[in-house]
C-alpha cells in the first residue's frame, strides 16, 4: 500500500475479489476441528432457539506488552445468527446454547518485570509450577543476569479465567439442555476444566463467526484435525520432552 506506483486497476481485481474471498472462506471451514460430539448432538439442522451469551474480553497485555482495554461483545452478530436460528435472550428460553471462549492467556506470557521468568499456563485456574525443572540452561533474554531461567515454584495467572466462569454459569443455567463450546484456540489447552461442561466442542483458529454457524447447523461438515496435542494437565506439560514429537500425555474425554 506504500508503493505510489501500484497498478490501481490490478488492485481492484485482487482486493475484495469474490472468488478469492470464497476460496478463503472454504479454507476457514476446513480448518475447524470438532473434538467432541456427545450423542451426536451436532448438527442442529432445525431452526431452534439458541442462547449465545456475550463474551467479556478482559483488559490485558498483548505480546508487545501494550494494554488492550476490556471489551464486551456478541460473538455472533445478529445479522449472521438470524440466518440459522432464533435468538434466545436467556437460557430459560433456549433449546441449546453456544458458548464462545478463548484458550487461556497467561498474564505477561512467561516473563514478569518483578518476578523474572514465570510459567506460561495452558489452564484457566492459577497454576503454580511445583514440578518444573529446578535448573533451566536456556538463558533467554540477554538483559537477564541469571543463567538459570527456571520458574519452579512460581505462579501463573490467566487473564481470561472469566471464560471458564462464563461456561460454568451457562452449564448450570441450561441444566440438561445441550451446551456447545466454541474454543477459539491460540495455545494448546488443558481440556479437563471445560470438556466435562460441554456436549460438543468445536476448535477454531481465528475464523469468522459464520463459519461456526455453518458447521453447527450442518450446512457444512467439520473435517480438520488438531495441529497440536492437548495435554492432560500442566504436570504433563512440565514432564514431556520439548524436542520430541508426540511425547505428551494427552487428555481423554468422557466419551
Each language-model region and where it sits:
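Long, well-ordered, tryptophan-enriched scaffold segments
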Residues: 1-4, 9
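C-terminal non-catalytic regions of proteins with extracellular/luminal or membrane-system context
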Residues: 8-9, 14-255
Amino acid at each position: 500500500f506504500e508503493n505510489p506506483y501500484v497498478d490501481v486497476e490490478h488492485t481492484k481485481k485482487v482486493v475484495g475479489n469474490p472468488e478469492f474471498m470464497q476460496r478463503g472462506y472454504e479454507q476457514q471451514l476446513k480448518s475447524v476441528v470438532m473434538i467432541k460430539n456427545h450423542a451426536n448432538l451436532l448438527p442442529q439442522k432445525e431452526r431452534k432457539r439458541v442462547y449465545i451469551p456475550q463474551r467479556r474480553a478482559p483488559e490485558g497485555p498483548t505480546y508487545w506488552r501494550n494494554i488492550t482495554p476490556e471489551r464486551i461483545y456478541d460473538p455472533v452478530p445478529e445479522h449472521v445468527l438470524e440466518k440459522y436460528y432464533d435468538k434466545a435472550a436467556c437460557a430459560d428460553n433456549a433449546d441449546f446454547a453456544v458458548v464462545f471462549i478463548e484458550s487461556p492467556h497467561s498474564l505477561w506470557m512467561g516473563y514478569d518485570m518483578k518476578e523474572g521468568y514465570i510459567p506460561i499456563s495452558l489452564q484457566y485456574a492459577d497454576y503454580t509450577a511445583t514440578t518444573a525443572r529446578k535448573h533451566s540452561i536456556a538463558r533467554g533474554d540477554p538483559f537477564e543476569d541469571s543463567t538459570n531461567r527456571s520458574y519452579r515454584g512460581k505462579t501463573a495467572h490467566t487473564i481470561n479465567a472469566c471464560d471458564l466462569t462464563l461456561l460454568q454459569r451457562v452449564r448450570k443455567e441450561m441444566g440438561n439442555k445441550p451446551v456447545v463450546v466454541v474454543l477459539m484456540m491460540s495455545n494448546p489447552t488443558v481440556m479437563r476444566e471445560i470438556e466435562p461442561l460441554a456436549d460438543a466442542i468445536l476448535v477454531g483458529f481465528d475464523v469468522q463467526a459464520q463459519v461456526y454457524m455453518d458447521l453447527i447447523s450442518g450446512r457444512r461438515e467439520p473435517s480438520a484435525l488438531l495441529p497440536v496435542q492437548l495435554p492432560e494437565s500442566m504436570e504433563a506439560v512440565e514432564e514431556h520432552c520439548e524436542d520430541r514429537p508426540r511425547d505428551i500425555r494427552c487428555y481423554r474425554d468422557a466419551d
